Design a protein with these regions (language model features):
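Solvent-exposed loop/turn segments at secondary-structure junctions
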Residues: 147-148, 164-166
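Conserved SF2 helicase motif VI
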Residues: 158, 165-187
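Residue-level detector of solvent-exposed, low-hydrophobicity positions
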Residues: 19, 104, 142, 153, ...
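Conserved C-terminal RecA-like helicase domain
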Residues: 1-140, 165-166, 184-189
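SF2 helicase motor core recognition
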Residues: 141-156, 174-178
Length: 190
């Protein structure tokens, strides 16, 4: 998805944003109404706004001067870390934090999607710096490594790979002993 978003072939991303704004996504509720119909009142009606939203996502979330493609960077010396960077960008915008990066990279290569795979031997750990105020990481994708326990004040959303696919308590464990969010009054409660 991120690669397609950055590429924006034939205006795909801008058109998708426009569909969201118009409430014509094809995602309907039980009454047959588009779930985004009537939403985004401020943004609706501005004819140029889909393109402006796309440019804003590129700049503020993906740290990309323009569109392009996705670079997946194996951070040498930092086991399990794959940095995500837009073509032409200097900073990483995301981190995939998983156990087996070699197998994951082989899957990406086999997919032949155009994602560039490279190595970065000098970058610091992105995961260790995730709570720093000047971190460039906006997107964190992970797997069972999150069940090991960590604290973060920056997480507002989590993407999980292969968690909770079988019966069991993985999701409960993840939030029971895994992630501690900032919480009320800096309590770091789960």
């Amino acid at each position: 998805f991120l690669h397609h978003l950055l590429e924006n072939k034939r205006g795909w991303a801008v058109k998708a944003i426009q569909k969201l704004l118009d409430g014509k996504t094809g995602l309907v509720d039980t009454n047959g109404q588009d779930i985004f119909a009537g939403r985004f009142g401020y943004l609706r009606g501005r004819t140029d706004y889909a393109d402006a939203v796309y440019r804003d996502i590129l700049a503020k979330v993906l740290h990309a001067p323009t569109g392009g493609g996705l670079h997946l960077c194996d951070l040498r010396g930092h086991a399990g870390e794959l940095g995500l960077k837009a073509s032409g960008a200097e900073e990483y915008f995301g981190l995939i934090y998983i156990g087996d990066t070699t197998t994951f990279k082989k899957l990406v290569e086999a997919d032949d999607s155009g994602i560039v795979i490279e190595e970065d031997a000098i970058a610091d750990s992105l995961f260790e710096g995730i709570n720093e105020p000047d971190t460039s990481v906006e997107i964190l994708i992970g797997a069972k490594k999150f069940m090991e326990g960590w604290n973060s004040w920056r997480v507002s959303n989590m993407g999980l790979l292969n968690i909770g696919r079988k019966e069991g308590s993985e999701i409960i464990q993840l939030f029971g002993r895994g992630v501690r969010l900032r919480g009320l009054s800096f309590s770091l409660k789960r």
